[in-house]
Design a protein with these regions (language model features):
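Nucleotide-activated chemistry modules centered on ATP-dependent adenylation/adenylyltransferase
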Residues: 1-549
Length: 549
């Protein structure tokens, strides 16, 4: 009898996750082991977006420990894999760094960045691990993934599951149409929400053996629903037609829904148990409130017409001023949490941006010409050492913005000057060249650029980041001044080897740094949020909103 290695996706803090684990592989594997079969390793794969509701994040950590302890006692070989986004897919870094905007409505880019891509990467690592243990080359056909999706979750989920052909009884190849292999089994696909809650109740009552009793899970769901028992909430019909991300716990930063009712219920709990979550919810609401604000957007596109040297004026990522404000707010919230945790004698319950993420924001600001050199580090010092606070404005006092406020015709204007293609205008540092301290390479397009450190993705070396902040930062702030281009700070960090770019991505960094330097020479940074000012500065002409009709 051939047994596949089992790869289990675990959901983030929903009942489907424990039900899937217990009903599916662990009990079956234990029975097979008792009958003398060689039992494959159970690989539990968990997704950590780095933005989960902190209460759920803490709960998930304890659940993974419980699973490991249960598996060890049952004689089951179990490995837990945690899929986290790298800096290239880090949602907060990309948002504050000026690379993306928040996902709203049906936009699911956040899910692709923080869950889908990291899970694919970890699944490949599992495949390599399986191959090493079996001593032979393995393919995707050697792994079956068990996932906790259910037809009853929502109308949208039922439609997507049906389109994929998911089944509770037979593994299906989701990649068959593309000629690939992605075998998936959905053990609880046919379970209703009441079935899940009933199952959890049986475990709590001790009638079903499980790796956990789920008492804490019930408490969390009760707090999410304003003190109501989760079963009563369902019977009352409050969740019968919930949309995606509705009454679930998810990312504290999620702006795909109008309001985070789960977090609000937790914050409103008597006794103030979850008061510390309010700043995160307030920040989430502020980002959503400013999303369609024209002054919170950068109006300069990121692609230049190579033949004409022109560029389009259209709403892009968030503006330099707004992203700087967001960084200050996040660091203020984070410092408040660190101080509160120290006073309470506990570990901080969340961290928004660590030192690697902070330097990644610094690098992106230099790449996009968003701020003067080392502005992110200066904001960090303001908050952490100088007592400066960035408070969230009163959202009720803000105008109500909609997508229509960004609806202007695209305008193409001159952008590149005669220095744009200069030797040291992109990914080359004149300071390093003058000191004979640069190593060069050639891009696929024939450009000669600095041969900086490369890796499997955009990365900030942790040890290098800590050494930079502790020993080199003061020197960097004195040597790299505000009258230099934003790329000066980027060159500084690249020269230290603190930043690693994706291998083969030299050309793209060279292109964006040329644009960054052009923004600096044209003095566009202060007006990147102002569409009319950009058009006037760059010499284009424009139609106003009224001319659209």
């Amino acid at each position: 009898m051939q047994l596949f290695d089992v790869d289990l996706f675990s959901s983030a803090g929903v009942p489907e996750m424990p039900a899937n684990v217990v009903r599916g592989p662990e009990k079956t594997l234990r029975e097979l082991a008792t009958e003398g079969f060689a039992v494959p390793t159970l690989n539990v794969m968990h997704s950590d977006t780095r933005m989960e509701n902190p209460v759920i994040h803490c709960y998930n950590q304890s659940q993974m420990q419980q699973m490991q302890a249960y598996a060890k006692a049952a004689g089951i070989e179990l490995k837990v894999w945690v899929a986290k986004p790298g800096l290239s897919n880090d949602y907060l870094v990309s948002l504050v760094g000026g690379r993306i905007i928040a996902s709203v409505g049906s936009n699911a880019k956040c899910q692709q960045m923080t869950k889908a891509d990291p899970l694919k990467r970890v699944k490949k690592a599992i495949l390599r691990d399986v191959a090493a243990r079996l001593g032979r080359k393995c393919t995707d056909d050697d792994i079956v993934s068990l996932i906790g999706t259910r037809f009853d979750e929502s109308v949208q989920r039922e439609r997507k599951m049906s389109e994929r052909g998911e089944s509770a009884f037979e593994a299906v190849n989701l990649a068959a149409d593309a000629g690939g292999h992605d075998w998936v089994l959905s053990p609880i696909a046919e379970m209703t929400t009441m079935d899940v809650f009933s199952y959890i109740g049986q475990v709590i009552a001790g009638r079903i053996e499980c790796y956990d009793r789920f008492n804490q899970l019930v408490e969390i769901y009760r707090d999410m629903n304003g003190g109501d028992c989760m079963v009563n909430v369902y019977l009352a019909g409050k969740q019968s037609e919930r949309p995606a991300c509705g009454h679930r716990t998810g990312c504290w930063s999620c702006t795909r829904v109008s309001r985070d009712s789960s977090a609000e219920s937790m914050i409103a709990k008597e006794g103030g148990e979850y008061d510390w979550l309010k700043p995160l919810n307030d920040l989430r609401n502020y980002i959503k409130a400013r999303h369609f604000d024209p002054s919170a957007r950068c109006w300069l596109a990121r692609t230049i017409d190579k033949e004409t040297g022109t560029i389009k004026i259209a709403p892009n990522s968030y503006s330099p001023a707004f992203t700087k404000e967001l960084l200050g707010i996040m660091l203020t919230i984070q410092l408040d949490e660190f101080d509160a945790a120290q006073q309470a004698g506990i570990k901080p319950r969340f961290t928004l941006l660590d030192i690697q993420q902070l330097l990644a924001v610094e690098a992106l600001w230099g790449r996009y010409g968003y701020q003067k050199p080392f502005t992110a580090m200066r904001v960090f010092l303001e908050v952490y050492e100088q007592g400066v606070r960035y408070e969230i404005p009163d959202i009720a006092a803000l105008p109500k913005y909609t997508e229509a406020d960004l609806r202007y015709p695209e305008v193409e204007v001159p952008f590149c000057d005669d220095q744009y293609q200069g030797m040291f205008n992109g990914l080359r540092s004149i300071s390093h060249a003058a000191a004979d301290a640069e190593f060069l390479t050639t891009t696929r397009s024939g450009m000669v650029v600095m041969d900086v450190v490369t890796s499997s993705g955009f990365e900030i070396d942790r040890e290098g980041a800590e050494l930079f902040v502790n020993f080199e930062l003061d020197n960097a702030l004195s040597r790299v001044t505000f009258d230099q281009s934003p790329t000066a700070g980027l060159h500084y960090l690249m020269g230290l080897g603190t930043i690693a770019i994706y291998k083969g991505d030299h050309g793209d960094w060279d292109r964006m740094m040329r644009m960054s330097n052009q923004i600096f020479r044209s003095d566009l940074q202060p007006i990147l949020h102002d569409r009319a000012a950009l058009i006037a500065r760059l010499g284009g002409s424009s139609l106003g909103q009224i001319d659209l009709f």
